[in-house]
Amino acid sequence: MIFAVGFGASLGAVARYALTSYGKKHWMQGTACPRPTLLINLTGAFFLGLAFALRLPASVYAFLGTGVLGGYTTFSTLNTEMVSLAENGQKHVLKHYLLASYLGGAVLLTCGYYLGSLL
């Protein structure tokens, strides 16, 4: 199972890197809001809720939930970007980013869980 988690984490991290690289080129013009990280963490929260609700076998959940989605989402980058926004005086953006990340993550995790419970 440990190899499944590691393999899943590598897939998630590569997906995060690709989406972040693309997002920095195409979604960051004219804004200080770290949109790629926000999108990654919100979609990750949704899919984690979905995976949890599906009551997958432990090995599948370890691969998808802990591995892929754990490698895909990023708590450390989120917090680093928040510190950067604060240091650069972007308090308004910081406030909205914080709210969107945590509240949005909780809402989307709940939506994913609800959808998964219907399947």
Curated annotation (Swiss-Prot):
Catalysis: reaction(s): fluoride(in) = fluoride(out)
Keyword Transcription: no
Activity regulation annotation text: Na(+) is not transported, but it plays an essential structural role and its presence is essential for fluoride channel function.
InterPro entries in the cross-refs: FluC
GO biological process: cellular detoxification of fluoride
Transmembrane segments: 1-21, 44-64, 98-118
Listed GO MF terms: fluoride channel activity; metal ion binding
Similarity comment: Belongs to the fluoride channel Fluc/FEX (TC 1.A.43) family.
Stored HAMAP family: FluC
Protein name in the entry: Fluoride-specific ion channel FluC 2
Organism per entry: Lactobacillus delbrueckii subsp. bulgaricus (strain ATCC 11842 / DSM 20081 / BCRC 10696 / JCM 1002 / NBRC 13953 / NCIMB 11778 / NCTC 12712 / WDCM 00102 / Lb 14)
